[in-house]
Amino acid sequence: MFSLKKLKSKLVGVSFVFSGVIALGTGVGLTSEHKYEHSPTLVLHEGETNSVGPRKITSEPWFYPVVGAGAGLIVVSLLLGLGIGIPIAKKKERMMIQEREEHQKMVESLGIIEEQNKTEAIEPTEEVNTQEPTQPAGVNVANNPQMGINQPQINPQFGPNPQQRINPQCFGGPMQPNQMGMRPGFNQMPPQMGGMPPNQMGMRPGFNQMPPQMGGMPPRPNFPNQMPNMNQPRPGFRPQPGGGVPMGNKAGGGFNHPGTPMGPNRMNFPNQGMNQPPHMAGPRAGFPPQNGPR
């Protein structure tokens, strides 16, 4: 099989040969015709006249050389086009196939690398999950037969109650009140454990004494009564609920005042004020009147 350069050189040589042959034939024909027309003697044969008339193109001496040269040039151009274009097309096709194969290999390698990265990321998490929790050194954990799968892990030194403290005599058990002495540098705190009777703690210095909050206990001295229906209205103020004045629709105008029933017109200010009770009719000393005309 010839190479591309050799094929090009041969086709160019053939084209030059064809063109030379055509030019030579055309020149020979023209010279012979010129000589025939300018001959000194004219010989007429039978049926011929000395007149000039139209002649066929095929009878011209230049017809066949010109037609042959044109056909040769067309053939040479076709051969050159096919000889040059077919190898170029095949070369491009091979390059496209090679690029496609390289792209496919690159995609496969990227997929393999991605799978390796996923497996490497999953393996450390599995190793962390499979590791068993280790107990710290120097800690003795007692066996608890009641602990199950869904029960929280409880340190037996502290017990199930987080408020319990370590007791050297019985691990996990509640401490008795007032078993620990006062630590230096700390204020003595009252016992926080339950089971103590009320009102056993004395008043702490620096704190105001609070009234009792438990029911059924007598009030402390110097404190007003906290039971309902025992508070009398203070001078200058309206009676409070439960202070000896019943509530409901029996209250009069204003705010829970006995007298007139409650209704939409219970507040008739600014003309009537708020219907003060008899012991609140006058203003307080040093203050202007609160309701009614001024």
UniProtKB/Swiss-Prot annotation:
Residues 172-214 are annotated as: 2 X 22 AA repeats. The keyword Transmembrane helix applies. The keyword Hydrolase does not apply. It is found in: Cell projection, Attachment organelle membrane. It is a multi-pass membrane protein. Residues 234-294 are annotated as: Disordered. Keywords: Cell membrane, Cell projection, Cytadherence, Membrane, Repeat, Transmembrane, Transmembrane helix, Virulence. Sequence repeats lie at residues 172-193, 194-214. Pfam families: Cytadhesin_P30. One of its GO terms (biological process) is adhesion of symbiont to microvasculature. GO terms for cellular component: attachment organelle membrane; cell projection; plasma membrane. InterPro entries: Cytadhesin_P30/P32. Residues 241-256 have a biased composition (Gly residues). The chain crosses the membrane at residues 11-31, 66-86. Adhesin necessary for successful cytadherence and virulence. This is P32 adhesin. It comes from Mycoplasmoides gallisepticum (strain R(low / passage 15 / clone 2)) (Mycoplasma gallisepticum). The gene is mgc2.
